[in-house]
C-alpha cells in the first residue's frame, strides 16, 4: 500500500506494514548520535525540551544547510546509517513517545519489541538521494543546539512536503524487511552450497 500522511499518529503507525510506501507532509526533526544523547540527558534531568517530540517523526540525518538572509535553506539531507543510534534508541523512544524514525540501513532486531510496545515504525529513506530529498524540505522552522553540537548534529525542525518515497522497513507488528531478506539469503545460500 502507499500512504501520504500530514501527521503520522500512533493510530496511523498501527496500519503500516513492512513493504508499504510512505510520503510525509508536515513537521519532522533531524536527530543523530549527539542529538539523541543531548535529548536523553535533558529529559532524564527533567529539563523541558524546546520542541515537542510527542508523536513526532525523527530523521536520522545530518543536513547541509545554507543561511540566506535570516533564514536557513536545506541544500542536502541524506539519511544517516541508523545503526549508529542502536544503543540509545530504545531509551529515546520511551522518553519521547515518537511515532516514526526515518533513516538508512535499519536498526537492530531487538528494537522491534520496543517499536511494538510504543507504536513506532522505521521508514527507510533511499540512500544517494540527498539533493532530491532536500527538494521536499519546504521550510526550516528552527534549529536547536547548533552552537553546541554543530550543523550535522543539531536538531533541525523542518516542514516537508511529499517527503519520500520511504519504505516501511520495520513495523509496529514485529516485522522487519531486513530480517526477511536475511532469511531468504541464508535459505538460498544453503540451497547453493548444499547445507
Curated annotation (Swiss-Prot):
It catalyses: (2R,3R)-tartrate = oxaloacetate + H2O. It holds the Pfam family Fumerase_C. GO terms for molecular function: L(+)-tartrate dehydratase activity. The active site is at residue 36. Substrate binds at residue 104. InterPro entries: Fe-S_hydro-lyase_TtdB-typ_cat, Fe-S_hydroAse_TtdB_cat_sf. Keywords: Lyase. Heterotetramer of two alpha and two beta subunits. This is Putative L(+)-tartrate dehydratase subunit beta. It comes from Methanocaldococcus jannaschii (strain ATCC 43067 / DSM 2661 / JAL-1 / JCM 10045 / NBRC 100440) (Methanococcus jannaschii).
Amino acid at each position: 500500500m502507499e500512504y501520504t500522511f500530514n501527521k503520522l499518529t500512533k493510530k496511523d503507525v498501527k496500519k503500516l506494514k513492512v513493504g508499504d510506501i510512505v510520503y510525509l507532509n508536515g513537521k519532522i526533526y533531524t536527530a543523530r548520535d549527539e542529538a539523541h544523547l543531548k535529548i536523553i540527558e535533558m529529559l532524564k534531568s527533567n529539563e523541558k525540551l524546546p520542541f515537542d517530540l510527542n508523536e513526532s517523526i525523527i530523521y536520522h540525518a545530518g543536513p547541509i544547510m545554507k543561511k540566506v538572509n535570516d533564514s536557513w535553506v536545506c541544500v542536502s539531507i541524506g539519511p544517516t546509517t541508523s545503526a549508529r543510534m542502536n544503543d540509545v534508541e530504545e531509551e529515546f523512544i520511551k522518553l519521547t513517545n515518537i511515532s516514526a524514525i526515518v533513516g538508512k540501513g535499519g536498526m537492530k532486531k531487538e528494537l522491534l519489541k520496543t517499536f511494538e510496545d510504543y507504536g513506532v515504525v522505521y521508514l527507510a529513506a533511499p540512500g544517494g538521494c540527498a539533493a532530491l530529498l532536500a527538494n521536499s524540505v519546504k521550510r526550516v522552522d528552527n534549529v536547536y543546539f547548533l552552537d553546541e553540537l554543530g550543523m550535522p548534529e543539531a536538531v533541525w525542525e523542518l516542514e516537508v512536503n511529499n517527503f519520500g518515497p520511504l519504505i516501511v522497513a520495520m513495523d509496529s507488528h514485529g516485522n522487519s524487511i531486513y530480517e526477511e531478506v536475511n532469511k531468504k539469503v541464508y535459505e538460498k545460500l544453503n540451497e547453493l552450497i548444499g547445507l
